[in-house]
Amino acid sequence: MFLLHEYDIFWTFLIIASLIPILAFWISGLLAPISEGPEKLSSYESGIEPMGGAWLQFRIRYYMFALVFVVFDVETVFLYPWAMSFDVLGVSVFIEAFIFVLILVVGLVYAWRKGALEWS
């Protein structure tokens, strides 16, 4: 037997948490003044006259470096709780964490060989 009524608070919270930003955007769209013109389309640089265009191209190598950083940053987030509760967890959790780290090391070696970690 499912006790779905126990989740009423969760569903209420989820609905309210979804409605608040939707209503905020909707109300600001109704009340905000609409102004169009060349000044609206120019880039804003803290009150200083813009020097050049707003579109700059970045090399793809920066994105690859950032992607590798994010992957290993997320790895740290996953490994920290495991390290803090290592003494109460069993051997199976240690093996799972070891496999997780091994997969990430394989990914690091792959990124290294492909040159994703090179700045030049």
From Swiss-Prot:
Signal peptide residue numbers: none
Keyword tags: Chloroplast, Membrane, NAD, NADP, Plastid, Plastoquinone, Quinone, Thylakoid, Translocase, Transmembrane, Transmembrane helix, Transport
Reaction equations catalysed: a plastoquinone + NADH + (n+1) H(+)(in) = a plastoquinol + NAD(+) + n H(+)(out); a plastoquinone + NADPH + (n+1) H(+)(in) = a plastoquinol + NADP(+) + n H(+)(out)
Top enzyme class: translocase
Domain of life according to the entry: Eukaryota
Membrane-related topology note: Multi-pass membrane protein
GO terms of molecular function: NADH dehydrogenase (ubiquinone) activity; quinone binding
EC number assigned by the record: 7.1.1.-
Pfam family for this entry, one: Oxidored_q4
Gene3D superfamilies: NADH:ubiquinone/plastoquinone oxidoreductase, chain 3
Purpose: NDH shuttles electrons from NAD(P)H:plastoquinone, via FMN and iron-sulfur (Fe-S) centers, to quinones in the photosynthetic chain and possibly in a chloroplast respiratory chain. The immediate electron acceptor for the enzyme in this species is believed to be plastoquinone. Couples the redox reaction to proton translocation, and thus conserves the redox energy in a proton gradient.
Family recorded in the similarity comment: Belongs to the complex I subunit 3 family.
Name recorded for this polypeptide: NAD(P)H-quinone oxidoreductase subunit 3, chloroplastic
